[in-house]
Amino acid sequence: AFAGILADADITAALAACKAEGTFTHGEFFTKIGLKGKSAADIKKVFGIIDQDKSDFVEEDELKLFLQNFSAGARALTDAETATFLKAGDSDGDGKIGVDEFAAMVKG
């Protein structure tokens, strides 16, 4: 799904680094997968993949399964990790993350 945007080796390394529950931090993950240095267009493409229901927002249930976008066998985020991730990205407080909020969080 991320072919041409992200390197498989970077994804594998990023997933390995947060395999244990409670070890996921979005900033570290975005850095490890090489997303921070990508163009706005590429970040928007990644957002489109994570936005499973194509609502133009990433909601809490989609964040919980965030890692599974990168590998089907990856774990779900814990409730605490999901809440922290949502809070970090939801700058307008509407309970979901839009594409501009996502881009700001990635670049953060």
From Swiss-Prot:
Ca(2+) 1 binds at D51, D53, S55, F57, E59, E62. PROSITE patterns: EF_HAND_1 (PS00018), EF_HAND_2 (PS50222). The modification N-acetylalanine is found at A1. GO terms for cellular component: cytoplasm. Keywords: Acetylation, Allergen, Calcium, Metal-binding, Muscle protein, Repeat. Ca(2+) 2 binds at D90, D92, D94, K96, E101. Residues 38-73, 77-108 form the EF-hand domain. One of its GO terms (molecular function) is calcium ion binding. InterPro entries: EF-hand-dom_pair, EF_Hand_1_Ca_BS, EF_hand_dom, Parvalbumin. In muscle, parvalbumin is thought to be involved in relaxation after contraction. It binds two calcium ions. Belongs to the parvalbumin family. Is regarded as an important allergen. This is Parvalbumin beta 2. It comes from Merluccius australis australis.
